[in-house]
Amino acid sequence: MLSVPHLDRDFDYLVPAEHSDDAQPGVRVRVRFHGRLVDGFVLERRSDSDHHGKLGWLDRVVSPEPVLTTEIRRLVDAVAARYAGTRQDVLRLAVPARHARVEREITTAPGRPVVAPVDPSGWAAYGRGRQFLAALADSRAARAVWQALPGELWADRFAEAAAQTVRAGRTVLAIVPDQRDLDTLWQAATALVDEHSVVALSAGLGPEARYRRWLAALRGSARLVIGTRSAVFAPLSELGLVMVWADADDSLAEPRAPYPHAREVAMLRAHQARCAALIGGYARTAEAHALVRSGWAHDVVAPRPEVRARSPRVVALDDSGYDDARDPAARTARLPSYRWRRGSALQSGAPVLVQVPRRGYIPSLACGRCRAIARCRSCTGPLSLQGAGSPGAVCRWCGRVDPTLRCVRCGSDVVRAVVVGARRTAEELGRAFPGTAVITSAGDTLVPQLDAGPALVVATPGAEPRAPGGYGAALLLDSWALLGRQDLRAAEDALWRWMTAAALVRPRGAGGVVTVVAESSIPTVQSLIRWDPVGHAEAELAARTEVGLPPSVHIAALDGPAGTVTALLEAARLPDPDRLQADLLGPVDLPPGVRRPAGIPADAPVIRMLLRVCREQGLELAASLRRGIGVLSARQTRQTRSLVRVQIDPLHIG
């Protein structure tokens, strides 16, 4: 495969007689292209060619293992077309690097896996839950968006759906955001399905282990693959079910070109394989809800009485909730301690969860006078303080130290904390609650499970440990840091983070209380209080549809120097009212937190241009951009190549 976009096409080669038996569709080969040897895959064998010139000869077969199956090739083509990418970029995500020793290992012949009986009672609490399991048992292509109840052991429900599908003779693919979720689902799945038939794929595996497990899926010995985002391309045949947990987690968005989202790839795969699909989570994204609204998927949601019985009591604590007479400093205090200290959670021996948006000490700084965010002078990354005795602010992107902070907007040298991190919060709690154990779970220091007993747990979103019997209470801090972001998904992301934490708290009948430090009138806070993720997703989808934002439309973001972006638009002939009804929006600045495209000098200004089309014209927009990228690629040399970064429906639009 060739890395330059204008050569992203098939090439014909002659096959020498000595390689004819091994050079079958799907195998890796080496061919000579413009005088150099390059890697490739055999796509098909034909007796003739449409090429009228002289054909070159295949140099050698790297391995007779057919790693690029017909199903995965179709998926690669579809993803490249959907995201305006090259097949080479998608193949880099889909097919891992070869490990010769692993290929030579003898694989046991796949047999029928041992599957324990599935108890459907866990799904009975949900409308259409039993019907969904029954459809999987009959190998029907049932598609559902599942709203997990608070306190639900989601991995058990996923494992039951997987076991039901494997028992029916089909394979299953389950995608989760991170290693911790993978471990949780692995433990639940192997309790029902023979461990030798279950494979886990994640980025943390070494090349040898990853390729061994990937081959187990290819050769048919694995019937259930659990993995993080890139595992969505696992080469399973007879696919019966594709599952995605917590599709709101941005870990499922691939940071490498062409930047596909695992949820979208999974749904593409379910459509191509005509198999069942399941998206689950405590909260719901507008994209998942759009699948329900379109009729492509069904709702699997518990009735309201069951939701109320299983959810904790949620209290919003705004400024009017502070008692100035009792605590004059409470109105400006970050930890409204007396309000939740008065609860009985710690006294009863239950742990209390404190969720903060960011890890570290003070991960974000701003000017004390004009409130402009403090950014690195080198790469424009956010500046942070690493500890109480830090010699200066440190860039979270490039690591440069700025010992003399001065605002680039107003010149002030006074700074303030925008967000207080988990480490600083733990310090504050330690002083406020002497004698109580304070546990921090954030960043590289993750605590998967708590021991029984009272404790204060400070955790960042997604790092919350599970507690035996659930937490007695939870405090959700710095809500403005989530809701106040200038981002399309700010409200959706905040609700997902809050509900993921609140789902770990005991039901209201057992005394569970969640306190969110936010104005109770905010619609997102109201959705948390009512525990209504479906209603929030419905409102979010309606609002985006009204103003023309994804998922009601497709948007392409073009990032790069102004001249190169303009050249791409001209090469792609966009916008073109006669061919494609596209709205051109911008130029705008890159959204906060979005890195600059690679290869562009640090001092070169970067803009973002947006192209918006209706849902029906998404593939046509991507095709136009692919053609334009190919034209630019053909014009440029290796020394001058500076292509625009193209993202279709990026998470952060600006």
Curated annotation (Swiss-Prot):
The protein's required cofactors: Zn(2+)
GO CC terms in record: primosome complex
Keyword Oxidoreductase: no
Residues noted as binding Zn(2+) 2 in the record, renumbered to the chain: C376, C379, C395, C398
Subunit description: Component of the replication restart primosome.
Entry-linked Pfam families: PriA_3primeBD
The name this protein goes by in its record: Probable replication restart protein PriA
